[in-house]
């Protein structure tokens, strides 16, 4: 059991590292190319970096589904391959009043489900092999309702747009780092402050959208206890005790009866 826990932790670590490195490499390369182009054209002021931020966000919007598919090892399944999964997604999408999303499975042990895509018409719902093995059918339906609610509320677009603000502020700050102009330095400091404030706002909005998705799952699925049960199983599976580290999972031991 301890060996399986170690393998699960290693798989999770590799997955996160792969996602991080792919994102950093891609957008780092894009940013470097645009920096060189801007330098050749004699561009380098705050306006250029603001436009650069918009460009990066737009590019992210266009290619982010492909990044998710590659990093999460997603493959889409037909109704013949996964009839029950398709039936649940179809029913929940009809109740939510949106087109049926594409249905995918990620062949990883980490229990997870996620929605992605550019628009409601381009929505995709994916579950991992780990969550399929962990939850019963009604719990999985509740989790799928949560993800479909993200598509219904256009959360992918909303988060892309709100994330643009701190990113643009960061680019503006970077454009003033090596400037000797006092006014430019003041602009840079203001942009840096705005960046940190913007990040906090983005985190708040993200958490709020998660609450809305929970509510949406109940509205279209009607089983809040199943969503709670699914979340409990997910937390328990990812807890230190389940991962073979009981010594780090004793923080709530005093709440348990002797």
Curated annotation (Swiss-Prot):
Protein name as catalogued: Protease HtpX homolog
User: Which superkingdom is the protein from?
Assistant: Archaea
EC primary class: hydrolase
The UniProt family comment states: Belongs to the peptidase M48B family.
Its taxonomic placement starts with: Archaea, Methanobacteriati, Methanobacteriota, Methanomada group, Methanobacteria
**Which Pfam families does the record associate with it?**
Peptidase_M48 (PF01435)
Cofactor(s) the record lists: Zn(2+)
Annotated gene = htpX
Write out the GO cellular component annotations: plasma membrane
Q: Which GO terms describe its biological process?
A: proteolysis
